[in-house]
């Protein structure tokens, strides 16, 4: 059954999002906090994209992937943050059935695309460290473009499968989602249909895309560590370790929180705890990613310094 047909057959045409709290004082504090996180996410990721595009020294496969990661992080957080922030001003926080399905599809699609992109980035680092002389011939512009396109296509096709399996179900009420956006566990809990097949589909998608990506990342970083130990110069080892440490930090944060939420049975869902975890992987991680890469990356710092020096000259 398609999502449109499911919408027509369901007695529920819209959902009510409970958000975080009903206390006005806490709502004001949370609004300011989340607005600050979202604006920081936009500022840092956009700055990183423009910095990479504007500096020819950063026109390499590694930074091509990094600029796409920043773009995904902007879209990923934007699937949740704007709607969540406006909901603070409404007594009844409603979202249509189709709007809920669209939010879920876009959010999960961007999240799975990021998982696949991080796998491509790990392969890029492995090629750079293990075969530095052959690296330019291995990581060609065409291959990098195909890897990025493949990440988006794979992510959104997987998301389409997940969204179709959930929103084809019948929803007859209640329609109250005890969450701040249309995430999988709280939406699935509202269905009047048997959700076993949907849970199996979700498990298979998460294991196939997320689990396989995580396994490939572990294998890649195993080879990378082995290659780093063979680098003769201490400076070369330090530079390689610095770059890989940034990647590993991002991978651990994203996969750790996402797999925790999406690979558990719906019966183990705890509202308060899982809302905090959801805030972390939907809002905090997209803000931290550019900071992690920027603060530990000499080339990014040098490019930023050039921009600041240029502004001083023209001011």
Curated annotation (Swiss-Prot):
Q: Which residues lie on this side of the membrane: Cytoplasmic?
A: 53-60, 124-142, 223-239, 296-315
Keyword set for this entry?
A: Cell membrane, Disulfide bond, G-protein coupled receptor, Glycoprotein, Membrane, Olfaction, Receptor, Sensory transduction, Transducer, Transmembrane, Transmembrane helix
Q: Specify where it is mainly localized.
A: membrane
What SUPFAM superfamilies does UniProt report for this protein, alphabetically?
Answer: Family A G protein-coupled receptor-like (SSF81321)
The reply to whether Transmembrane helix figures as a keyword in the UniProt entry is yes
Pfam families from the UniProt entry:
7tm_4
Q: What is this protein called?
A: Olfactory receptor 5A1
